[in-house]
């Protein structure tokens, strides 16, 4: 699939051209270092991210030099490309396979809208709910989520406020329009236009367009080995936080995988503004004083409740109950660290892309409160 690219700057004038040539040579040399590093030490996610961040700084500094040179020659300033394509979600959607491509022995997809919970395990959260799988009392949880967010983002800031990343970046979705999937489909791909990176891209673009400076890391933390992916993603996040201490929110974007005993895959779905979307579910970890060390879990819980309230209030039926459980997921790194499941492996990619946009719009609403 063709990658989307930002609009270019037009033809540079002589001084800018010289600076541009210098940029090209510098980036070529840096890419050569990247290749040599990959040969010597292998595709370690933390190393990849360090090189990516270094290359990003080099590019930004060189682009600034080109810009300053162009200004000296009174070049016409290039128009800044919008963060979100003018076509909205349509600009991101991909062609899906029709039933003529359905293979023999295809597996079944079952669509279901998962409702908000009720009963002793569930705590109301605006129009949504929180499923409490911990020993923290419901009364305590209900009181905690009435507190304000533990951080304040800066709107239209030059400094990053949000980081989106993917511990299991290679998770993907079905590419069929019909309710079937291919036999042997492992629901994984390294193609960033088809896996979790594509969903994260929509979310980051939506947030940036609203004035929330958001970074999106596309490191494949679960490739080539699934084992150790959370250690890999932790190193990645720590590098970003070291380089950009302004970051308040870290979102680990995944998809779920719900399957019946006979192999049918579940697709959590809802309809928003006439278009089918995947349902989403926030997971917030809790400290248990032994195996899960999250002493500031209450801060993340407040954030989870605010986001859940905003999303379900805007789009009834869009969210599944927040899962509050003894999970770690590196949620000790910021007071705004959460994991969100965008649909499941039974959803098609377009449902997930749309859900990513809706989840980001819900986050914008929550942060404006």
Which role fits each region the language model picked out?
Residues 17-248, 257-262, 357, 365-369:
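N-terminal catalytic or cofactor-binding beta/alpha core of small enzyme domains
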Residues 169-172, 220-224, 255-260, 287-290, ...:
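Solvent-exposed loop/turn segments at secondary-structure junctions
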Residues 182-186, 258-293:
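A short, glycine/acidic-enriched catalytic loop
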Residues 237, 262-270, 322-328:
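Alpha-helical scaffolding within the catalytic cores
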Residues 319-369:
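Active-site-adjacent mobile loop/cap segments within catalytic or ligand-binding domains
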